[in-house]
Amino acid sequence: MRVLGIETSCDETGIAIYDEEKGLMAHTLYSQVKLHADYGGVVPELASRDHVRKIIPLIREALKNADTRIEDLDGICYTKGPGLIGALLVGACVGRSLAFSWNLPAVGVHHMEGHLLAPMLEDEVPEFPFVALLVSGGHSMLVKVDGIGQYEVLGESIDDAAGEAFDKTAKLMGLDYPGGPRLAKLAASGQPANYKFPRPMTDRPGLDFSFSGLKTFVANTIAAEPDDEQTRANIARAFEEAVVDTLSIKCRRALEQTGYKRLVIAGGVSANVRLRAGLAELMEKLGGKVYYPRGEFCTDNGAMIAYAGLQRLKAGQLEDLAVKGQPRWPLDTLLPV
């Protein structure tokens, strides 16, 4: 089976061709970072319009790069949610329309399931069951995964997600958009142990996250300290260490609660070097193993949507003719495969 994958949930247009036997044959990605930079964040209307401009040329490019004709395709997979409704509808309209005109089955894919399954695109794939830490700009959650579609959310963010906290803190520090990667780069030159920031919600039982208070703590620290490059770097490092420690503590609890020895980390924040190192150290202590996608598949992309969608097409979970987007869509409501 060979499918076309379409991702348009936020500010990246991702297209991919995935074959069940040959693997990933082609993927193209267009990022709108420059478009939104002047606004300090994603402007939904601008994002939707840019998806409209880019999606068809990118589909043509992916088909060409994969040496794939329309008649070679067995289905179309597009992100149905969660995400920005306008952006979602661009991908849904194009994906469902192409499927109808080409007489192909279609499936709407859960964006976070795409992230969760992104490590399956690598040479070394995690076996079920495992615990997944999904960390992105819009989501932070720990999920017990017993199979595709067999998900139990163990904990999630009750306010700011980890990626959102990175971006907002970067903005407080005067860093340009996108702030998260810039803050991590600044933190690399920071000195350890200059500041001690709280590890939110680690002093009580449970697996939920909360990063809004940490962001406020950082804001107060910035206001009270000198405004020089080294001080900013030290604050950035202390913030990053606080987030990484918090995520690591929660992951340990989730692994102990489930008894699992495999940890998957995915989503945009999973590209963070300090987080990867911290979780690798944790899993070594626990006698387990951590899995994550390569850098290009940590951010939103069409490859993960193509892979996740193919699994559901094989299970016969097809989309009807209606074009739908779901800006909110609980992960644990998905059907098992």
Swiss-Prot record:
Residues holding Fe cation: H111, H115, D300
Catalytic activity: L-threonylcarbamoyladenylate + adenosine(37) in tRNA = N(6)-L-threonylcarbamoyladenosine(37) in tRNA + AMP + H(+)
Cofactor (UniProt): Fe(2+)
Single GO molecular function: N(6)-L-threonylcarbamoyladenine synthase activity
EC number: 2.3.1.234
Keyword field contains Transferase: yes
Stored SUPFAM superfamilies: Actin-like ATPase domain (SSF53067)
Subcellular location: Cytoplasm
Record's GO cellular component terms: cytoplasm
GO aspect biological process, one term: tRNA threonylcarbamoyladenosine modification
Cofactor note: Binds 1 Fe(2+) ion per subunit.
Its biological purpose: Required for the formation of a threonylcarbamoyl group on adenosine at position 37 (t(6)A37) in tRNAs that read codons beginning with adenine. Is involved in the transfer of the threonylcarbamoyl moiety of threonylcarbamoyl-AMP (TC-AMP) to the N6 group of A37, together with TsaE and TsaB. TsaD likely plays a direct catalytic role in this reaction.
UniProt-recorded name of the protein: tRNA N6-adenosine threonylcarbamoyltransferase
